[in-house]
Amino acid sequence: MEELTPIILQRYIVDLSQKGNTKTGKGLAPNSVNCIILVLHSSLSMAYVLGLSKEIHVDKIKRPKTSEKPVESFTKEEQKMIEQAVLSDKRDKMFGIILCLYTGLRIGELLALEWSDIDFTKAELSVSKTCYDGQDENGKSCRITGTPKTESSKRVIPIPKQLIPHLREIKKRSASKYVVGNGSKIITVRSYQRSFELLLQKQKISHHGFHALRHTFATRAIECGMDVKSLSEILGHKNPTITLKRYVHSFMEHKREFMNRLGKLL
């Protein structure tokens, strides 16, 4: 503890920002780094109070700037084009794109989803796993499956009844335990992202990341009048405040539409 200095802490924070993600080797998000700084501040303050270390002013450490990325989602016309392209595609694995559009699943949750996670009678799916691309003990690329990073990410999502017949047919043909499978082969996150990118290129739709499917689901849900608490639970957010903050523009547009309808009574 005596060797710990503000300079060492600052270097540590820089390392976290540049290569702190042990899964990807890339930097941690600014919000994640700032959370770590808060824990450090609390721990070091307590150590000082207990006489275990000298006082270190963590509050003087330069923090990474946080900025809310604009929410990217597809228009209704683009969504329809994507759906038609998926339904005309002979590869069953592509149906996962539609499943994301109507459940808000993250790509890792989608690829980790097994047939045993779907209750066809109740028309709902259980999210209890996620996956990401990593390396095995020999340094070879592989897909790693684990538990979601938060308890709120573990959830049960109702499936629109219109999707059930499609899922039943795909299950009959499937030789994989995964809903999005390719026989005995495991589909990596990157390869599925690439399949989605190629679909967008073929349809001449402006490129958005795979996460835009989740944002599109949230946007459509708001447009249909879903309340923020229900949407938050379906998305697996820790609390409705996160949902409201992220989709504040969509909620405002929804309010404006209702107010304009009300104005027509004049």
Predicted regions and their residues:
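Active-site/catalytic core of tyrosine-dependent DNA strand-transfer enzymes
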Residues: 160-206
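DNA/chromatin major-groove-contacting recognition/catalytic segments
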Residues: 81-85, 136-143, 224, 245, ...
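Catalytic-site neighborhood detector that most strongly recognizes the C-terminal catalytic loop/helix
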Residues: 69, 73, 131, 164, ...
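Basic, Lys/Arg- and aromatic-enriched nucleic-acid-binding interface segment
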Residues: 26-30, 34, 49-55, 59-113, ...
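Short, contiguous acidic/charged loop-to-helix segments that flank catalytic cores in large enzymes
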Residues: 71, 86-88, 144-154, 180-187, ...
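N-terminal core-binding DNA-recognition domain of tyrosine site-specific recombinases/integrases
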Residues: 1-52, 68, 186-191, 206-209
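Conserved tyrosine-mediated DNA breakage-rejoining catalytic core shared by Y-recombinases
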Residues: 112-169
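C-terminal catalytic core of tyrosine-transesterase DNA break-rejoin enzymes
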Residues: 31, 49, 98, 102-109, ...
